[in-house]
Amino acid sequence: KMMYPIGNALKSILDKILTDPRWDLKFIGMQLIIEGLALAAFQSTRELAKDPVLYDMLGLIIRDEARHVTFGVNYLEEFVSTLSEEEKNDRAQFAYEACLLSRERLLSTDVFEYFGWDVEEARQFQLGSDLIQHFQKLLFQRVMPNLARIGLLTLSLIHN
């Protein structure tokens, strides 16, 4: 029996979010990054769904997930505007690191290791796949505009 526990990258993102004592980082991490991952995953699955019931069900799930993201954006937009530049940069760096981990989460390195494959070769192959590139595009089309809207796509982050 094969089981795939939570991957290292997703575990790392969740640990980073849940262990930080600042409530707003939990909001940024969960409402924007993790929910953004969920939206992208459901959207890519919906685009491939051939069963009309699954297609419709995924549409409802996407709508619900989008409400979660919107709630986070609306709540954080006002709060972030009250932060100092240093605090904004700190939160922007947190979001940036979570996005990098999100990208790594797409790669099944645990599975590659399990099957004894060359991890870097399999990783590069997977990064080049149309499906992964499409998923990344969906993910970052959802996450980046929201980070910009709440004021966390800072110049220091862009020049990073």
Residue ranges and their predicted role:
Residues 85-158:
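Extended, helix-rich structural scaffolds rather than catalytic motifs
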Residues 42-60, 74-89, 118-123:
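Inter-helical turn/loop segments and adjacent helix faces that build the functional surface
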Residues 7-32, 48-49, 97-112:
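Acidic/His metal-coordination segments adjacent to aromatic residues that form catalytic metal sites
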Residues 28-42, 61-72, 76:
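Alpha-helical transition-metal enzyme core signature, strongest for iron centers
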Residues 23-27, 52-66, 91-93:
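Alpha-helical scaffold segments that form or flank carboxylate-/histidine-based iron centers
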Residues 1:
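Carboxylate/His-rich catalytic cores and anion/metal-binding grooves
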Residues 7-11, 69, 85-88:
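Alpha-helix initiation and N-capping motif
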